């Protein structure tokens, strides 16, 4: 019996779950919106919310804790520079989960998880180019 056991196994080993959540958190921070299954979205939400809170702390120890979880320095720098400043006045509730129907292949419940007040133009490499262009325009 699994009385009082928190979290979902998602039919994966512990190491696979840990790696999957790290990859999903990095993708969510990079693109600010991802489409996944509803149980995965519900599991990744508290992980990313705690990472945003680490970003809001902003000290070296918090940055190292975030890097140990995400394992991508570029994503952590976006988390600490862009996302943490955006939510500086908000106490929690940085993400929203919206149901997005069912997947055709296996009828799995799908969901969109995204940042509240997200940058609608955040599209990975294109987002970096756009931000760099805006910074050059401000500097000039």
From Swiss-Prot:
Keywords: Ribonucleoprotein, Ribosomal protein. Signal peptide: none annotated. GO terms for cellular component: cytosolic large ribosomal subunit. The keyword Ribosomal protein applies. The keyword DNA damage does not apply. GO terms for biological process: translation. SUPFAM superfamilies: Prokaryotic ribosomal protein L17. GO terms for molecular function: structural constituent of ribosome. Part of the 50S ribosomal subunit. Contacts protein L32. Belongs to the bacterial ribosomal protein bL17 family. PANTHER family: LARGE RIBOSOMAL SUBUNIT PROTEIN BL17M (PTHR14413:SF16), RIBOSOMAL PROTEIN L17 (PTHR14413). This is Large ribosomal subunit protein bL17.
